[in-house]
């Protein structure tokens, strides 16, 4: 999208917001941002604030090793697998809602095989780590009416 199209769409969006916004005696933060609220909800707007967070972290590892010396001679095999998963969800409502969620996962694997009689060897390793973090906050700040005349 070039700059001209962006500016045109921005102007159209602002004009639509101005045309559709209703006048409210006490202007709330939400109204200043472009949404319109009925006059009856201005005093209890703090109850509508909320914050939500979701985090997921998953890990998987698989290791396999194999060594054979045939016909019908020595053979070796080794296998390793692992999986970890963490999921967190936090939803908070209220005046000072805070959200914090953390998640971490780790999986390690190691496999080894060895054969004698003319030698055969195999080795496999695997390591996985995963992390996730979510933060959030919601608070309606009090208006400062100092020095203002009604």
Curated annotation (Swiss-Prot):
Residues 57-67, 119-135 have a biased composition (Low complexity). The keyword rRNA-binding does not apply. Keywords: Signal. GO terms for cellular component: apoplast. Residues 57-82, 119-150 are annotated as: Disordered. Residues 1-21 form the signal peptide. It comes from the Eukaryota. GO terms for biological process: mucilage biosynthetic process; seed coat development. The keyword DNA-binding does not apply. Belongs to the UPF0540 family. This is UPF0540 protein At1g62060.
